[in-house]
Amino acid sequence: MTSLEDTIIVKNKLDSVGCGFCLAKWTQVTIHLGSGLTHSCHHVKAHPIDLNELAENPGALHNTGFKKNVRKQMLNNERPNECDYCWRIEDNTGMTSDRVFKSRDPYSWSDFDTISKMTGDENFYPRYVEVSFSNVCNFKCGYCGPAFSSKWTDEIKEHGPYKFKYVNWKYNQPDESQ
C-alpha cells in the first residue's frame, strides 16, 4: 500500500475500530534486554517488562499488562495518552500520522481483521521484532536517547543534557547504569 488513496482507506478502517486504533501495538516490538524495557513504537516512552508477568508468560516480553491496557483503550474508541505524538500530528496539521503508516505496513495490515475483533486481553505475537542487548552503540540517533545509546551517554556526560523544549521526562539524562 503506497498511494494516497490506500492511506485514506487504511485511516478510515482504523478509525472504524476506534479513534486511537493502531496495529503497531500488536504487531511491532522493540525489546531492550539490557534495561528490561519494551515498546511498540519509537514515539512512546519504553516501559518496564514485569518480571513476575514474564515468569508466568514468556510472551510478556511483548504482551505486557501495560500494553494490553493501552490496546483495550484503542479498541474502546479511546486515544491512549502515550500516543500523543500521533494525536498532535492528526489534530494540528491534518496530516497522516505514523499510526496509519505503521498500521499499513504489510506485516501489520494483514492482521487487521483478526486484531480488530480482539478484546485487548489476548497475547499477540509480533511480526516485526527488534532486540537490543545493551546500550552499547556507535550512533547518537536523535530518536534514541542515552538509555539506548552509549554514545549519547558519553556526549551528555561531556557536554551536559540537551535542552529540549517539549520533552518532559528524563529522556536526555545520562544512563547511570554504566
Short names for language-model regions:
Residues 3-106, 125:
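Accessory C-terminal segments flanking Radical SAM cores
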Residues 89-178:
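Conserved alpha-helical substructure of the radical SAM core
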